[in-house]
């Protein structure tokens, strides 16, 4: 039985907000030796969503791993969100997920085995929806619950979509609204309205598969998924990798209804402030202390795709998304490199 168990009460931080902050991570990775392998097509140099390794003529592996803490209290839903979050990295690269392995850190003394069974069932159902096969996994008994997956996908090397290839003149399109990290903080505090919780869960359990398929149809210049470093953090990675500036229009960036009310109540994850403090030197904004900016730094879990498309491709993408009932909004444009990596207007 899993009723009455509040998973979020067992962890310090929820979802992707539990990741290491960008400053500490960059420092830890700064001394890594670059791999000298001609088959490694995408490595860690531009902080892309997944690695890509060529295994034959016209075929490459897309490899990623993602582990999160609970950001909702229902075990099955947590498992489904965690799997959607891990799969997203493969979709963002333009790949097709084929296999996955569970990674479980479980407090066996604090939770019954039925909780783990429900988590794994949720993850498995998301994998099946994505057309991927679960091939195994690994467990560790831990004081804090964590669950994620290592996912492998396939891709043609000529169809890899990177985060460092945005071009000046491109339009920026976002495929999910922001605010799930803030909502998760409210869930942990028992202060999230039921309707807002349900809406956040709907977005977090939604796979990025259809949006990624449309991306390939329309020919995006670049793509990344918006996760733990927030929209601005991942936009900075795109800008620095491509040598451009990304301009975001604050009023055009979608935020879940009700999130700003939670911000006003102080229900903002520490990871949001960590992201803001780290990326502030690279961002031009009217006022960095404006609360309206906080959702742009909010750590997202299973967030949407941030796409960089030529004006004509963006038009096709938005029109096709509308026809197919997919969420997509133009949120900015790509400029030649300026004084900042991301300019918020």
Swiss-Prot record:
The active site is at residue 16. GO terms for cellular component: cytoplasm. Disulfide bonds: none annotated. ATP binds at residues 19, 46-48, 66, 89, 137-139. CDD domains: SelD. It comes from the Bacteria. Keywords: ATP-binding, Kinase, Magnesium, Metal-binding, Nucleotide-binding, Selenium, Selenocysteine, Transferase. Signal peptide: none annotated. InterPro entries: PurM-like_C_dom, PurM-like_C_sf, PurM-like_N, PurM-like_N_sf, SelD_I, SPS/SelD. Its EC number is 2.7.9.3. Its cofactor is Mg(2+). Synthesizes selenophosphate from selenide and ATP. PANTHER family: INACTIVE SELENIDE, WATER DIKINASE-LIKE PROTEIN-RELATED, SELENIDE, WATER DIKINASE. This is Selenide, water dikinase. It comes from Geobacter sulfurreducens (strain ATCC 51573 / DSM 12127 / PCA).
């Amino acid at each position: 039985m899993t009723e009455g168990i509040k998973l979020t009460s067992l962890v310090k931080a929820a979802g992707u907000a539990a990741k290491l902050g960008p400053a500490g991570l960059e420092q830890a990775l700064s001394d890594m030796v670059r791999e000298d392998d001609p088959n490694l097509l995408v490595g860690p140099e531009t902080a892309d969503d997944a690695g890509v390794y060529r295994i034959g003529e016209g075929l490459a592996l897309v490899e990623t791993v993602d582990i999160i803490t609970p950001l909702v209290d229902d075990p099955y839903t947590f498992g489904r969100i965690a799997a959607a979050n891990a799969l997203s990295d493969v979709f963002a690269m333009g790949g097709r997920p084929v296999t996955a392995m569970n990674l479980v850190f479980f407090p066996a003394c604090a939770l019954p085995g039925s909780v783990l069974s429900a988590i794994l069932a949720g993850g498995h159902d998301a994998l099946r929806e994505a057309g991927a096969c679960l091939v195994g996994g690994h467990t560790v008994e831990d004081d804090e619950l964590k669950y994620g997956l290592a996912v492998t996908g396939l891709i043609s090397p000529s169809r890899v979509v990177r985060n460092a290839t945005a071009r000046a003149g491109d339009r920026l399109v976002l495929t999910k609204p922001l605010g799930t990290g803030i909502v998760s903080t409210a869930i942990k505090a028992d202060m999230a309205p039921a309707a807002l919780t349900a809406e956040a869960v709907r977005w977090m359990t939604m796979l990025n598969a259809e949006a990624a398929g449309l991306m390939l149809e329309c020919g995006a210049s670049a793509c990344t998924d918006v996760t733990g470093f927030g929209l601005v953090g991942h936009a900075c990675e795109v800008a620095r990798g491509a040598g451009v500036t990304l301009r975001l229009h604050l009023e055009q960036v979608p935020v879940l209804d009700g999130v700003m009310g939670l911000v006003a109540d102080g229900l903002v994850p520490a990871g949001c402030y960590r992201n803001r403090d780290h990326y502030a030197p690279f961002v031009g904004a009217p006022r960095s202390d404006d609360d309206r900016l906080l959702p742009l730094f909010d750590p997202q879990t299973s967030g949407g795709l941030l796409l960089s498309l030529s004006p004509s491709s963006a038009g096709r993408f938005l029109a096709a998304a509308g026809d197919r009932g997919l969420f997509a909004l133009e949120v900015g444009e790509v400029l030649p490199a300026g004084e900042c990596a991301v300019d918020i207007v």
